């Protein structure tokens, strides 16, 4: 079996990180709308998490923010004039559109794409399909730039295939890896791919909150990637209604372990049976289920226990769960988390990480990263300038401290100076990460 590693590609928080409540069904986003954010603090929190993963011996990469404000969107919607006038006019006449154009949501890289490792793909390459994220306007802007970003990081087409997003049409609504789990005996060996969907394209959905992922989208991605051993369980309707807008709010898995809440799947028994059948002859899945009695949905969503990173750490026999500090601060979630370590199950210990700025918008540690299983050769073929090191951390921390504001209210997003500040910051970042001088739209039109 070829040796492989689960690399984490974390989204770097952008200069316009803010709380404007753009995401129906995301309870934290709605609750904190209107609050003052700290983009500098948020970006530094993200760096600290990346450093912890790197210190544990895990491959770590940095994905750049997207250009925001997205003036091109506002121009498409009828605003004209110099960029600064476009922005101020949009805030005056259509503030909801302007807010969407300013969102720093690409930081949540779990939604960047769905990934199939070379061990599972029909042609032996690593496949990526950037998510179209069409359920919410602010996120629907991301797919094309995400594809560009992934093609810079994984440029070798003999090893990597970065596809275009699926058609931007409701039948193919796709939210990326936040709804995908891969189980396996070893990262380099064959795995079972769980594509978790919320609704079928031709079925009526009458939920209070949107079901963002269609089954048809994941079926198309599975065909496109040639992903072997695919299972298509439905996400629990009760979970979506309770605020689990992606499956990674109620479920996380790696290697043989699937750690999930009892409401994560609409039909838990069928899911388990199909996963076992797909894994037959390869490995025995380990299902670690938490009941509603032990952790009610309200505490689950408040604590984000399952929006943790489940890690295979070199030198450790059991898995490590990297959870947000909100899990530690919630008595019921903390009791569940700590019970994992004292059990004889696959999860041996829990660490806690502070990503509060992201959490206030409904994004825990798992939201901030895209997992990519890579062999040694594939790892070596990735853009080395984006590989997280102590030197890169120092360079990015200096850049963030110089370029980012430490206070940003929703009203501040209308400041034309923020547009200039953001572009100057991103222009410098392209040099730090070796992205070239044509990475962002403003660079290509200068």
Curated annotation (Swiss-Prot):
Pfam families: AstB. The active site is at 175, 246, 367 (nucleophile). It is an enzyme of class 3 (hydrolase). InterPro entries: AstB_sf, SuccinylArg_d-Hdrlase_AstB. Keywords: Arginine metabolism, Hydrolase. One of its GO terms (molecular function) is N-succinylarginine dihydrolase activity. The keyword Ligase does not apply. It catalyses: N(2)-succinyl-L-arginine + 2 H2O + 2 H(+) = N(2)-succinyl-L-ornithine + 2 NH4(+) + CO2. One of its GO terms (biological process) is arginine catabolic process to succinate. It comes from the Bacteria. Pathway: Amino-acid degradation; L-arginine degradation via AST pathway; L-glutamate and succinate from L-arginine: step 2/5. Its EC number is 3.5.3.23. Substrate binds at residues 20-29, 111, 138-139, 212, 248, 361. Disulfide bonds: none annotated. The keyword Lipoprotein does not apply. Catalyzes the hydrolysis of N(2)-succinylarginine into N(2)-succinylornithine, ammonia and CO(2). Homodimer. Belongs to the succinylarginine dihydrolase family. This is N-succinylarginine dihydrolase 2. The gene is astB2.
